[in-house]
Amino acid sequence: MLDIKWIRENPEKLDKALVSRGLEPQAERLIQLDFARRSHVAKVQLAQERRNAVSKEIGQALAVSDEKMAERLRSEVEELKVFLSSATAEEKQLTESLEKILSALPNIPLDDVPEGKDESDNVVIRHFGLPPTFNFTPKEHFDLGQDLKQMNFERASRLSGTRFTVLSGALARLERALGQFMLDVHVNEHGYTEVSVPLLVRDEIVYGAAQLPKFAEDLFQTTDGRWLISTAEVPLTNLVNDEILEVSDLPLRFSSLSPCFRSEAGAAGRDTRGMLRQHQFWKVEMVSITSEEQSLMELERMTECAEDILKRLGLPFRTVVLSTGDMGFAARKTYDIEVWLPGQECYREISSCSVCGDFQGRRMNARYRKEGDKKLHFVHSLNGSGTAVGRCLIAVLENYQQADGSIIVPDVLQPYMGGMRCISA
C-alpha cells in the first residue's frame, strides 16, 4: 500500500507513475478525500476535548449547587454525543473509502524502470548460453512426455478438469528432483532458510502480500473462507506480519518448495496445451525481508541466485527488466528470467524477481528499528521464483531431447535420480 503522506507531498509523481502503468491519475481525488478525513478527525478530537471539559464543569457547577448551569452543561454534553456519533461514523466511512482506493493502487516504479505499455517494451539485459541445434525437428514437451507414456493429460482431465497433468515414472521423479535440487542450492549455497509453509491462509495474509482485493478472481477460496496459496511468497512474506525487527537481524532470507494454486481466470485461451499454465504446480520461492538501504542490492543478488539454477542445469536463458506496463502490482522493479524452449522456438518466463519497497511491509504492519533511531520503519520485501518447477521440467525435456525421443538427464540432477542418465519409453 502507498503512503498517503507521500501522495500529499508528491501528487505529480503518483499520477505520472499511474499513467506509466496505463491507469488514470488519482492524486487529486485521494488528496481531497484525505483532507475531508483529516478534517473530520480534527473535529472529532475537538468535540471530545470539549465533552471532557464540560463534564468537569458539570461537577464544578454541582459543587456550588448551580443546578441551572449544570443542566445547561448536560444539554451541551448530549449535543456533543450526538455530534460525535455522526462525525465518527463519517470519519470511519471516509477512512474506509480512502483505504479501499489505496488498496487498489499499484506500487510506484523505480526511476530506472523502462516506460512502456506491455511486454513488447521490456528490455533484455543479458543472455546465457546458446539455443541448442538439432539435426531433427525438436518436439514440444507435451509430445515428448506423451510419447514417453509418462505425461498424461487425458487422465488428469478425468480427475480434475483442464489445466492439470499426471506425471508418472521417471518424469514424476524428475519433477521431484528438480524441486529438491533447487531448494538444496538456495539453502546450502545461497544462504536462504528453508521453510515449510501452510498452503491455506487467511484473508489478511493474502492482503498483506498485496493479492487481495485486486486478484481475488485469480485465487481459489475454500468453503471456510481461507485461500489456497498462489505462491509461497504469500506465507513467506507474512512470516514477519505485525512484527518489529531489529535492523541487525536483516536481511532475512526464506525459501520454500510448495504446490501453488491459480485459477488462471485471465488466461482463457492461452497455453491451453501442456504444462505451461496449470491450476496446480510446484515452485521454489525465494523471499527476502530487508531494510530500505539493503533492498536494491538484494534484488540483484536474488536474480543471480535464480540465474544460477539455470546455469547449473545448462539451460539457455535471457534476463529482461520489465517495463512499467508489464510489471506486477506490488513491484517497484522486476527482472524476468526467460528460458529457451526449442519446441516453441522462443523464450518463456521461468522466474520473476521483484523488489517491492515497503509496499507489502505497510500492508503487513511489519517494521524494523534502526540502531540509535527511535522511529520505526516499514520493512522492504523482495520475492523471486527460484524457479517454477513445472516450467523447468518443460525446459529440460525440450533442451535435452534426443532424436529417438529420449531425454538426457542433466548432470546435476543425476544424483537425485538414482544415477539415471537417460529417460526413455
Swiss-Prot record:
Gene Ontology molecular function terms on file: ATP binding; serine-tRNA ligase activity
CDD domains: SerRS_core
Top-level division of the source organism's lineage: Bacteria
E.C. code: 6.1.1.11
UniProt KW keywords: Aminoacyl-tRNA synthetase, ATP-binding, Cytoplasm, Ligase, Nucleotide-binding, Protein biosynthesis
Residues given in the record as L-serine binding sites: 231-233, 285, 385
Coiled-coil regions listed: none
Pfam families in alphabetical order: Seryl_tRNA_N, tRNA-synt_2b
Oligomeric form and interacting partners: Homodimer. The tRNA molecule binds across the dimer.
Domain notes: Consists of two distinct domains, a catalytic core and a N-terminal extension that is involved in tRNA binding.
NCBIfam families assigned to the protein according to its UniProt record, in alphabetical order: serS (TIGR00414)
Protein name listed in UniProt: Serine--tRNA ligase
Organism: Bartonella tribocorum (strain CIP 105476 / IBS 506)
The organism's taxonomic lineage, starting at the top: Bacteria, Pseudomonadati, Pseudomonadota, Alphaproteobacteria, Hyphomicrobiales
